[in-house]
């Protein structure tokens, strides 16, 4: 590596090492694409996304009571909404130009377990975690609950943030009361990483409550970025001075709100 060059993005091997799992939890099996197509693809377009975008699929590990010593989870609903018997860790090697975000969602839909997914492609890696629940209208079917929470790393990502993320993924650092709490801990780790891209690495890992507040602030920042971009585009096109002034004032107001949110993300 030359002076000043960014380190390469981590890969699935690095993530697995960071987790620090016991040998009993390792699976290391190849998964056929047909599993994703049969269980996750909704349209012909989704099938093409999987077929054209994914090179290799591997089931890296299975986290359950017998392999990592973390109890299962069943909520107290009648009937239960969630039952976590294990958490899967999968990796996907993507081809250049693959639709990364869509593939992540399709993979999470196709696996009937809460999932930590590693998507690797040349020069970049993304991690995503999603909760699951029982389907309300189809007995015995497990579905993705909401949108997977994602974080992306590439060669431009600050090394300190990547290092802090890898440390926060260690099984010994994650909450282990039950598998639901473990999954939420993984989501909180990704939240802390995304916040660190705006504020710098935290001095201490965020609490569950702090991570929840960070997720709300991060989503609001994304919404504000979109609004600001639209307003700037409108200001460039609008030739009327009063309208330009009004648009620029709104941009200034939203930018100030964004700055306050970023300040709130820090320790």
Identify the residue ranges that each predicted region occupies.
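N-terminal, leucine/charged-rich tether regions that mediate assembly and partner docking
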Residues: 1-136
């Amino acid at each position: 590596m030359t002076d000043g060059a960014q380190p390469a993005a981590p890969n699935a091997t690095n993530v697995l090492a960071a987790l620090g799992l016991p040998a009993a939890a390792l699976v290391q099996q190849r998964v056929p694409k047909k599993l994703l197509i049969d269980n996750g693809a909704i349209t012909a377009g989704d099938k093409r996304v999987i077929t054209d975008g994914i090179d290799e699929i591997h089931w890296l590990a299975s986290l359950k009571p017998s392999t990592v010593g973390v109890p299962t989870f069943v909520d107290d609903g009648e009937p239960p909404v969630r039952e976590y018997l294990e958490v899967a860790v999968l990796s996907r090697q993507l081809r250049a130009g693959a639709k990364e975000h869509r593939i992540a969602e399709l993979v999470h839909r196709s696996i009937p377990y809460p999932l930590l997914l590693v998507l690797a492609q040349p020069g970049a890696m993304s991690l995503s975690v999603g909760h699951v629940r029982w389907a309300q209208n189809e007995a015995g079917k497990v579905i993705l609950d909401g949108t997977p929470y994602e974080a992306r790393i590439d060669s431009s990502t600050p090394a300190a943030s990547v290092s802090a993320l890898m440390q926060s993924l260690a099984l010994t650092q994650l909450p282990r009361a039950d598998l639901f709490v473990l999954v939420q801990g993984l989501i909180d780790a990704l939240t802390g990483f995304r916040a660190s891209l705006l504020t710098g690495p935290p001095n201490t890992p965020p609490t569950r409550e702090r991570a929840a507040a960070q997720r709300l602030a991060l989503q609001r920042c994304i919404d504000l970025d979109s609004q600001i971009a639209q307003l700037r585009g409108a200001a460039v096109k609008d030739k009327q001075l009063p309208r330009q002034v009004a648009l620029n004032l709104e941009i200034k107001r939203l930018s100030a709100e964004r700055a306050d949110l970023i300040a709130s993300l820090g320790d």
